[in-house]
Amino acid sequence: MKGYEVNFDGLVGPTHHYAGLSFGNEASTKNCNNLSNPKLAAKQGLLKMKALADMGMKQGVLAPHERPHVPMLRRLGFTGDDISVVAQAMRYSPELLSSLSSASPMWTANAATVSPSADSQDERVHFTAANLNNKFHRSIEAETTSQVLQAIFKNERHFVHHEALPQVALFGDEGAANHNRLGGDYAKRGVQVFVYGQQHLNNGLPGPKRYPARQTREASEAIARLHRLDESHTVFVQQNPDVIDQGVFHNDVIAVSNQQVSFHHQHAFLNQDQAFAEIRQKMASIGEDFISIEVPENRVTVDDAVATYLFNSQILTRPDGGMTIVVPEESRQNAAVWSYLNDMIQMGTPIDAIQVYDLRESMRNGGGPACLRLRVALNETELNAVNPKVLMNDQLFMTLNQWVDKHYRDRLAQEDLADPHLLMESRMAFDELTKILGLGSVYPFQK
């Protein structure tokens, strides 16, 4: 049976703003308090989705989350009607309201970890929503993420949904941003590579000193158990703590994979040679080669990789069998990075084409092309069981652009977050969106 990789991109929400909430993410910190343009951000994301669909890729849409997150404000003691709750929060702490108004669910690489049916002992696709324990503004996402995923992947014969891991540092989980799957055809067995930043139950191991390691080995191992993965086709690799301290807050800022190919920096992993030997051996056991494209420090520094999000790219297999790397405009603007990319596509590797997209609104908040998408490998039967209303086509692209034009602002500052009109505008937009995407009542205000 034929297999597909379906990319589900997050639609940017109407409260997209620059709050500098993500310590360890240098772009997020640098652009704190800048004016944002939610309408442009959403349209930039939609353009990428449509362009990839037009290339023949399977492309889906994940809905934004309700923000401001009034239920959490109520848990924190703010009372009255919803507009009063938001106003009180603004008076008490603009920073708290900003945190609970973040449009961070757009970065769906952190939404969940997904294991395809070919790898799972029960032959079903498994989803575990990420607890995103390391950052308060993201730790509130798991419940809505789970409900959105369940509305898209409903059929229990094909799909299994697990609760997020416990909300403690020991099980800090950042989802697919620290997870790669290598293999051949998307419908056949692969090798899953879980990347972690620290191991809580073994304090003797090296770890970062400046920035937090957001993913733990304990979390990755728990997900592998939940997803019923075979140990002989699963690898756990530690990210190099030195690059975490240089701003590589997720593995997808320093490495990306597709099928047999791993595209990564020279300093991406701790004990890199040993890790790749294990991956190579496990790939051989499923009859596949492991192709390592390693970018040396003397061609692209870690600092340049972080600044341009070279590795926060997408590698996509086209219908003709070749691979295209999708990079942000910032990669083209950096001479060293652009020179390397153009040399790479002449090297005879499977990657033979480059596509550049302007995602500046997301990039300024610290998220590139790979941050915006959740990869789901499906066979034909499973793809036919997906909610068809979320799959990108000409009609959905036009409808969502009109929806954005109708509901989104083109300028948003932090002080606008307490505007009662913004709350009501957003809720009206989300009510309409759930009908467009056929999601049902997934938002707290709809219940």
UniProtKB/Swiss-Prot annotation:
It is an enzyme of class 3 (hydrolase). Its EC number is 3.5.3.23. The keyword Transmembrane does not apply. Pathway: Amino-acid degradation; L-arginine degradation via AST pathway; L-glutamate and succinate from L-arginine: step 2/5. The active site is at residues 174, 250, 371. InterPro entries: AstB_sf (IPR037031), SuccinylArg_d-Hdrlase_AstB (IPR007079). Catalyzes the hydrolysis of N(2)-succinylarginine into N(2)-succinylornithine, ammonia and CO(2). This is N-succinylarginine dihydrolase.
